[in-house]
Amino acid sequence: MLRKVGQKFMKLEIISDDRLSSDGKNLSRVAWELSRTPDDTTPLDTILSIDAPVNEIPSVVMSVECTILEREVFASFRDHVMWARTSRVDAPSEFDVPDYFKYSETMDDIVLLKNRINADMKAGIIQDEYRLHMPICAKTSFTTRLSWRGLIKIYKLYKELAKIDEYYIIGKTELDNKFQLHKYADNYSYVDPIPMLQKNEMVSGKSGPIVTVFQEMTIGLRAQVVRHRNYTIKDNLMEIIKAKDCWTRTLGDKIKISISAEIDFWKTVVNKRQCWIAQYGIWKDIIVVAQEYITIGEQDLPCNKGFCPYTRDAELRHTDDD
């Protein structure tokens, strides 16, 4: 049984609802009619139940409040549209967790993690390091756009995750209460955005125009990598989700991940991430391996034209205000 105390946490707020046309007709219906003869009488519920691009036309923009781990699940869909509130926005020492965890045996471990952050702060450790003690059950928020089809894919994923951990029943219920997705979901295929990385895939290399980098990195870095949607990613996130200590894993805990993309895209990412002051330290291990397969020179640095586009970000990290 789901704990009675603090049953609900995931919060969905619709910012912009783009499911209806200006004359009040569902956009899936509009798109469907444009592709069919005028005498087509397919019911709207039937159209909304079809697992096809027609249901990628209507969409909603939402603010989502959830755990860090849930944010990473959302971002694992390679077609995600997201602008996240990173854990840097709020003081790491003041992180909060859902009531679901406050009244559980994990709370003692969560308190210890908060104490470690405070101890590091007193010792003068920089924020880049002490924030890694934040647990992945900590609250965060982000803004996202999801199509009708995307909503159902997320809903079906939550149904699967709820079989592993009852906490996900909260998110599944919130999604269903907001959009009544259960009425349409059965006809949609289940898409696993976090397929398990296999042992024979734990290698780096180059095949034609594709470069693959295998790394054991922090969950915090994974959170940055996964935002680059042109990357094909496989990792052991599902293994972490299934672990008994899942919710007290931290941003600093390791995750095994394989990252693949075309050479030109790798160069685009390096161009953004190779600034030694702003982000190079965080991305260094990935960049070093990628450089074994990609020719990267001074022209690929973000400041190659004599102007640093990340001046303010670099200053904030240097002063520990970011």
Language-model-derived ranges and their functions:
Residues 1-322:
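Family-specific signature for flavin-dependent thymidylate synthase
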